[in-house]
Every structure is written in C-alpha cells, then in structure tokens.
C-alpha cells in the first residue's frame, strides 16, 4: 500500500499513465483503439483486509505502507466501499472493550457488496471456544441493527460461522439484475462498478455470436452467466470446489438453462478435448455435441500454459481477460500468428496501483 498515491485529484492522470503504458506495451501488434473503463475515484473496492494492533487498552486497524516503511493506523480507508468504511468504526468500537473478542485478534477481513451485504472475518492466534461463539453471536445481533452482516471466526484449523460464510451480490448489467453468491476466501472481482463494465463489454463484443461458448477458469460463473444470453450453450470449467458450488447456485438464481459447469483444471480439460486422457468428471458430458466457435479465458497471472495456448488457437474467436499484461503479451506473440486483435480494453480494477486489467477479442485471420 502507498498512502500518498491514493489521491482522487490525481486519479485521471494516473489512469492516463496506465493507458499510455498499455498501449506502448502492445505497440508491436496491430490493435484497434484502446477502450478505457475508469473506476470510481474512492470507495471502489468491495473487499479489504486489515491487521489489528494492540496497544494497551487501545485496539485499531492498520496497514503497512511500503513506501514509508511503516504501519499506518486506519480509521477509514479510501479505496474500500462506503459500506466497509461505515462498518469499520462500529466494529472496532464493539471489539475494543470486549476481552473475549479482542484477545489474540490479529486481522479483520471485510467482504461487501453493491447490494448492501457485508461479511466480517475475525482472525485469531488462539482456538475459539463456546464463550467466543456466544460473544460473536451477540456482536452480530448488535451490528444487525444497522447492517446486513454475517461474522466468521477463524483460527488454525478452525472456522466458526454466524450465520453465513457468503454474501449475495446483485449487479445491474445492461438493465438486468444478475445475482452472484460470493463465498469468503474465494475469488471475486474486487471492484464492483468496474466488474459491471467488464461484463457489459464482454456481452457487447459477443452479441452476434453463433454456436456455443467454452470458458476456462470460470470462477463462480461471473462471466459465463452474463454471456449465456449470447450463445446456444455454454460449457465452463473451474477447479476450485467453493467456486464451482457458487457457480451452480448462481446458475439457478439467474434461471440460466444453457450453462454447464465442470470441475476441472484448464490443463486437464485441454487433455480431455485432445482425447489424451479420460476423466470420471466428464462421464455423461458429450464434449463432441458442443459447437464452440468462441472460447473465453481469464487465466491467473501466469497466463496460459503452452498446451492450453495451442488449444485456444483452434477457435474462431478468443476472448481473453488478463490480470497481467506481461503474460498477455507473451501469449499474444503466439496467438497473433493465427488471430488478429479486434477489440482492446483497459479496466481499472485497482486505482492508485500499477496493476492493469485488460481484455482483448481475437478473431481468426
């Protein structure tokens, strides 16, 4: 964290620097005009994590500022959602005088939504007992007079939940509300407003699609649920079980009837498509019945591995969302041989940082 960089008056200039950097990084490729999707300048981040400092009777949140090489007391936090900022003082005021809840508490995590729900995780260097659970339940009831809140207590090999370990998000996407279950400690898009812009961009660039869609790394179904309207059928893969469970919930909640989720890694699915290996998880799934002209990938920071990269080249259109422009650059050196970039976007998920989220649509040459 760099506190000095978090200046809303400097946001537009910082975003312009990112735009220039991204455009320059891909200068050797033939790209269309870069579409830039800005963030809110404050209160854009739907989750936040704070360490907790004990100082006599005092107790407070802090973060470490690498630029200043010191810990910074956080009464409020400009990047965090307004809901998190509203919760921060209320929670700390309740924790500070409570010896059971504050003892050996070392971290507080918040997960909030645009729909008004918030999940608070309290992390401890001690085992949690019945007395802790009783006090935590009373804390939840007290906070519930102002917030739609759930509380989780975590310790080594221990997790106690009052009453849910998830929130339900509702995103307005092109005039339609999309519902998403977001589970604690599972990946969710951190910037709610930019997440909406990403979904709307993906819907727009696939609007006239034919055939089916294959998505790798689908998470909780964030994109596949939004894109299902543009395709006959959608087949999506995800390895993390909590994310797959959330995706199944989200399919039902949004009444999607043309989307199937398979719990597999992208690498294993690539082998399955190539008929290199058979997998029990694919029993009853007729891969040959799918007519996937478009593939959607949103890989981790390492980008696509060589086998997956070769596999995606077999599709007419590739929609690639990247959280690391350097690995996207490496992947495009291969993909550019068979496909051309027809849409190019920058999504500012993380203002006041060097992080750049980008998206490209590639179509066969």
Swiss-Prot record:
It comes from Shewanella loihica (strain ATCC BAA-1088 / PV-4). S-adenosyl-L-methionine binds at residues 189, 217, 222, 238, 298. Dual-specificity methyltransferase that catalyzes the formation of 5-methyluridine at position 54 (m5U54) in all tRNAs, and that of position 341 (m5U341) in tmRNA (transfer-mRNA). It holds the Pfam family tRNA_U5-meth_tr. One of its GO terms (molecular function) is tRNA (uracil(54)-C5)-methyltransferase activity, S-adenosyl methionine-dependent. Keywords: Methyltransferase, S-adenosyl-L-methionine, Transferase, tRNA processing. Gene3D superfamilies: 2.40.50.1070, Vaccinia Virus protein VP39. GO terms for biological process: tRNA methylation. The gene is trmA. The keyword 4Fe-4S does not apply. It catalyses: uridine(54) in tRNA + S-adenosyl-L-methionine = 5-methyluridine(54) in tRNA + S-adenosyl-L-homocysteine + H(+); uridine(341) in tmRNA + S-adenosyl-L-methionine = 5-methyluridine(341) in tmRNA + S-adenosyl-L-homocysteine + H(+). This is tRNA/tmRNA (uracil-C(5))-methyltransferase. It is an enzyme of class 2 (transferase). One of its GO terms (cellular component) is cytosol. It comes from the Bacteria. Its EC number is 2.1.1.-, 2.1.1.35. The active site is at residues 323, 357. The keyword Transferase applies.
